[in-house]
């Protein structure tokens, strides 16, 4: 099956997202094409990855690069959201500097969203900006986090509060590696795919309702879904690279979702990012319904689809206790969309009719959270 290419055209930078099977075996050619350097074989590549991906795919990638006389330095961190931290960032930076990689060398993010965010942030800072390539290995990273240049780490005050916009030279999305992804991780990525339909693509959401189960099997339908997702995000990012306007729509479900991730201390046994987005999207639509913006039937339809693929949709689906409404509200107040202490949410007026709601009254949000917590206690 031939690889597909989606191009992101920005004001000062243009790069390709290459999507298809068995791309690890073609990595040297793709990297060389993207970096466009005459002394390519003298370059050194730092491969930042995690323990899970390293055990499954690192040998294959290193063998491909070594075969093409490319020097590699693997940097392996612990798998999981807790690696998006200052301490792990320092380890990655220290190892790249210790290897004496130069600005013209390259950092490869070989993993899921955590690795992409972490490695990209490191690349943005080292020598004021190194070459950077994304090689996402999860569905979530292939359709969302590797596309658009957001990098960063978490803080005890909240998720993704420390970071930078730093675009890669290219994104190489090998769809074959998704066959080794645990079902829970694949479902988590699917939540972000559903999000694109709910933002402003009702036809895509309806297509997912018909074809969603096929995406969980490798084949042409899966690749089509990934390509369509990347095309949608590429269009949004091209119009609003630095999230000053419509790119904020991509945060549908994320205000509530990030709140829940922080409240559960980024504990993957309780919640992972895509799951938090699934619950967050339902909460966003329920809050919209409370404001008389959407009909309850739409919420039921979305929830039915998410449940059909095994995603959590309610607070009661999260193991363990949650903080009280006031504590959750304090976490929302740290959301990166907050401006001049005013709350901003992505809400909905119907299927594929999401919008940016500014100056949302805090008392309405607090009352809504209290109601949701009462339902599970």
Curated annotation (Swiss-Prot):
Its cofactor is Co(2+); Zn(2+); NAD(+). One of its GO terms (biological process) is aromatic amino acid family biosynthetic process. InterPro entries: Dehydroquinate_synthase (IPR050071), DHQ_synth_AroB (IPR016037), DHQ_synth_fam (IPR030963), DHQS/DOIS_N (IPR030960), DHQS_C (IPR056179). Pathway: Metabolic intermediate biosynthesis; chorismate biosynthesis; chorismate from D-erythrose 4-phosphate and phosphoenolpyruvate: step 2/7. HAMAP family: DHQ_synthase (MF_00110). Belongs to the sugar phosphate cyclases superfamily. Dehydroquinate synthase family. Catalyzes the conversion of 3-deoxy-D-arabino-heptulosonate 7-phosphate (DAHP) to dehydroquinate (DHQ). This is 3-dehydroquinate synthase. It comes from Bartonella tribocorum (strain CIP 105476 / IBS 506). The gene is aroB.
């Amino acid at each position: 099956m031939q690889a597909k290419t989606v191009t992101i055209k920005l004001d000062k930078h243009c790069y390709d997202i290459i999507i298809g099977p068995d791309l690890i075996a073609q990595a040297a050619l793709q990297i060389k094409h993207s970096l466009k350097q005459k002394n390519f074989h003298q370059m050194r590549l730092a491969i930042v990855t995690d323990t899970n991906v390293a055990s499954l795919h690192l040998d294959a990638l290193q063998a491909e690069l070594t075969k093409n006389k490319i020097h590699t330095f693997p940097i392996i961190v612990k798998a999981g959201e807790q690696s998006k931290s200052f301490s792990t960032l320092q380890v990655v930076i220290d190892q790249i500097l210790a290897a004496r990689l130069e600005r013209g060398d390259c950092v490869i993010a070989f993993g899921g969203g955590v690795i992409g965010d972490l490695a990209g942030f490191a690349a943005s800072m080292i020598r004021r900006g190194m070459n950077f390539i994304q090689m996402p290995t999860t569905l979530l990273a292939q359709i969302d986090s590797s596309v658009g240049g957001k990098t960063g780490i978490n803080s005890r005050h909240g998720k993704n509060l420390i970071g930078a916009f730093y675009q890669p030279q290219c994104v190489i999305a090998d769809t074959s590696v998704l066959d080794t992804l645990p079902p829970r991780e694949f479902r988590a990525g699917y939540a972000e795919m559903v999000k694109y339909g709910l933002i402003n693509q009702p036809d895509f959401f309806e297509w997912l309702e018909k074809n969603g189960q096929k995406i969980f099997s490798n084949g042409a339908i899966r690749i089509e879904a990934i390509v369509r997702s990347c095309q949608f995000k590429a269009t949004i990012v091209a119009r609003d690279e630095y999230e000053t306007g419509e790119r904020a729509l991509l945060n549908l479900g994320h205000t509530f979702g990030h709140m829940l991730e922080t409240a559960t201390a980024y504990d993957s046994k309780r919640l992972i990012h895509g799951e938090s987005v699934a619950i967050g999207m339902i909460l966003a639509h329920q809050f919209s319904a409370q404001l008389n913006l959407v009909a309850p039937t739409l919420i039921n339809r979305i929830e039915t689809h998410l449940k059909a693929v095994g995603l959590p949709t309610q607070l009661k689906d999260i193991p363990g206790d949650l903080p009280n409404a006031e504590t959750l509200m304090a976490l929302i107040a740290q959301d990166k969309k907050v401006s001049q202490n005013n709350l901003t949410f992505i809400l909905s007026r119907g299927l594929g009719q999401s919008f940016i709601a500014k100056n949302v009254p805090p008392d309405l949000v607090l009352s809504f959270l209290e109601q949701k917590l009462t339902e599970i206690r």
